[in-house]
A protein has these predicted regions:
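Membrane-water interface regions at transmembrane-helix termini and the short interhelical loops
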Residues: 51-55, 83-84, 127-138, 150-173, ...
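Juxtamembrane transmembrane-helix boundary signature
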Residues: 67-101, 108-116, 436-439
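C-terminal membrane-solvent junction of multi-pass transporters and transport-like membrane proteins
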Residues: 366-444
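Membrane-interface "cap" regions at the ends of multi-pass membrane proteins
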Residues: 1-61, 74-75, 204-211, 229-239, ...
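Transmembrane alpha-helical segments of multi-pass small-molecule transport proteins
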Residues: 36-40, 67, 110-111, 137-160, ...
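Selective recognition of specific alpha-helical transmembrane segments in multi-pass small-molecule
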Residues: 38-43, 69-78, 113-122, 176-187, ...
Length: 444
């Protein structure tokens, strides 16, 4: 491209250096997409507080039905479009989103995904550190800080290696939490039939499950483009998502809810350090003498989601800022994450899920609308900034985070459930109404 030609459109540096992943480097869905996504849902962070505010409000069948719906929504609304765009273009999220937000406007969703995955890195590191200290039967703050530092930097180093290394590790480690969940479920099985929810608000239980699952998955869903670029065809995209996302949500989520229900049905109370008896740690302590080993194995299995989050975050910042070496940006991000862990800021899981779902759901909604308008094809980056995408994102984010916006009537907040799903739909509709003109494609 002639830099002296004033008629040539501005092309950001991260687009100039973007190179598609060739077909020869791609692999079947069962070698990358499915095992890595399944590892994310097998992470104890997913179901640690899944029963809080859900199982306590409604019966078990309603909660399991909500998991089925949540799994299908995560696949169809959040994962499918980015993954298909990644497969078609061979490019990661930060490139494919420029069709929706523009070449100059792609910085926002790129940095947003990177920042939120950095937050997830901190959240997962906090959980791993906490479980290791629980396994050691220690509440020492010094030990907690030392473990957080060692875990955080070690996982960041692994994250630099890339998704192929993470996928290889996932093949083995994904079996560990699955076995642990089944052991915990078996240990609490006798109390399941005795469980009775303390409240009868089935809609609150149903929407609560949707919000937690979607909020947990939104960042990984947008990162579907990064997985799609490693898929050979649409069949890999579909099967990898249905097995690794939809099925994993139902199987893992149901087992965790049943284990907690069994523990409470048998009379278990909240263990030390737990916010309520509906945390999954209640069910783990009910295992008995082996609970310490179970905590250690759950922590070891968190290697997969920790490295996944750091990989996506590092990929984001290195793509947006190609002049900064990837190892440097990764270690800076790891330092920020470790600080959040040591200060216990990363311990508020449900609050973090609400922010993730509210801010990334409209990004996925706008991208899905653009995908439909473009004939379900990747047409390349738009020149400049596509304001239709930004307007859809702003309005959708407002809807998605209405619950934490001050001055909003409580009746509005009560009606805004499931907020993350509503924010997706609002952004999707707003973008369709804006109907931006056919993309002015930047020629490479």
């Amino acid at each position: 491209m002639d830099a002296n030609n004033s008629n040539e459109p501005f092309v950001p540096a991260y687009l100039k250096v973007a190179v598609p992943n060739p077909k020869s480097n791609r692999a079947p869905w069962f070698k990358n997409i499915a095992p890595t996504y399944a590892g994310i849902f097998l992470s104890v962070v997913f179901y640690l507080q899944l029963a809080a505010g859900t199982l306590s409000q409604g019966p078990i069948p309603i909660c399991i039905l909500a998991l089925v719906v949540a799994g299908l929504l995560c696949f169809a609304l959040y994962y499918y479009t980015p993954a298909m765009l990644g497969m078609q273009s061979g490019q990661p999220f930060y490139v494919v989103c420029t069709s929706t937000f523009g070449a100059s406007g792609g910085y926002l969703p790129g940095f947003l995904l990177g920042a939120l995955n950095l937050g997830f890195f901190a959240v997962v590191t906090f959980a791993a550190t906490n479980f290791i200290t629980l396994g050691l039967h220690s509440r020492s703050t010094v030990l907690f800080a030392i473990i957080a530092i060692l875990w955080g930097y070690a996982m960041a180093f692994i994250g630099i290696k890339g998704i192929h290394y993470v996928a290889k590790v996932a093949h083995f480690l994904s079996w560990v939490p699955l076995c642990m969940v089944l052991i915990v479920l078996f240990a609490n099985r006798t109390g399941i039939s005795q469980y009775r929810p303390p409240a009868n608000h089935p809609w609150a239980a149903f929407t609560g499950i949707l919000e937690i699952v979607v909020g947990y998955f939104a960042a990984a869903g947008a990162a579907g483009a990064d997985f799609g670029q490693n898929a050979r065809d649409s069949r890999d995209v579909k099967l990898g998502g249905l097995i690794g996302i939809a099925l994993a949500i139902v199987v893992v989520g149901s087992a965790a809810l049943l284990a907690v229900a069994g523990a409470i049905g048998a009379g278990a109370t909240a263990p030390p350090g737990a916010a309520s008896p509906f945390e999954f740690t209640t069910a783990i302590f009910n295992v008995g003498a082996l609970s310490g080993m179970v905590f250690f194995l759950f922590a070891a299995a968190l290697l997969v989601p920790t490295t996944f989050c750091m990989f996506i975050s590092a990929n984001s910042f290195s793509t947006m800022m190609p002049r900064i070496p990837r190892p440097i940006s990764t270690m800076v991000g790891a330092t920020i994450g470790v600080v959040l862990v040591i200060t216990h800021t990363a311990g508020n899981l449900l609050g973090f899920f609400q922010i993730v779902g509210g801010s990334l759901s409209p990004v996925c909604g706008a991208m899905a609308a653009d995908f439909v308008l473009c004939g379900k094809k990747w047409l390349g980056p738009r020149q400049g900034i596509n304001w239709a995408g930004y307007v859809a994102w702003v309005i959708g984010s407002f809807v998605g985070m209405l619950g934490i916006v001050p001055g909003i009537p409580q009746s509005w907040k009560n009606a805004d459930h499931p907020a993350a799903v509503y924010s997706f739909l609002v952004a999707f509709i707003i973008y369709l109404m804006a109907r931006p003109r056919k993309p002015r494609i930047i020629q490479a």
